[in-house]
A protein has these predicted regions:
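Amphipathic, hydrophobic secondary-structure cores in small proteins
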Residues: 1, 9-10
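Absolute protein N-terminus
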Residues: 1-2, 53
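A generic alpha-helix surface/boundary motif
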Residues: 2-3, 41
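Short Gly/charged-rich anion-binding patches and loops
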Residues: 3-4, 25
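Residues within the helices of the helix-turn-helix
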Residues: 5-6, 45
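Major-groove DNA-recognition helix of helix-turn-helix-type DNA-binding domains
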Residues: 11-48, 52
Length: 53
């Protein structure tokens, strides 16, 4: 249901620090759309739409 920072760092082959920035950015977009977000996690469907569409 959610990807964690560690999973995103592994998939994108980036540092954990960069993965946190990506997650924060995606969660900021979700908040603007009215969704409740969880720090350090991003919904799998939303992540896949943004990175693998």
């Amino acid at each position: 249901m959610f990807y964690t920072v560690d999973e995103i760092a592994t998939m994108l082959q980036v540092s954990k620090s960069k993965a946190y920035k990506i997650v924060a950015s995606l969660n900021k977009e979700l908040k603007k759309m009215g969704y409740i977000t969880i720090a350090g996690r991003v919904p799998k469907k939303y992540f896949q739409e943004k990175f693998y569409a």
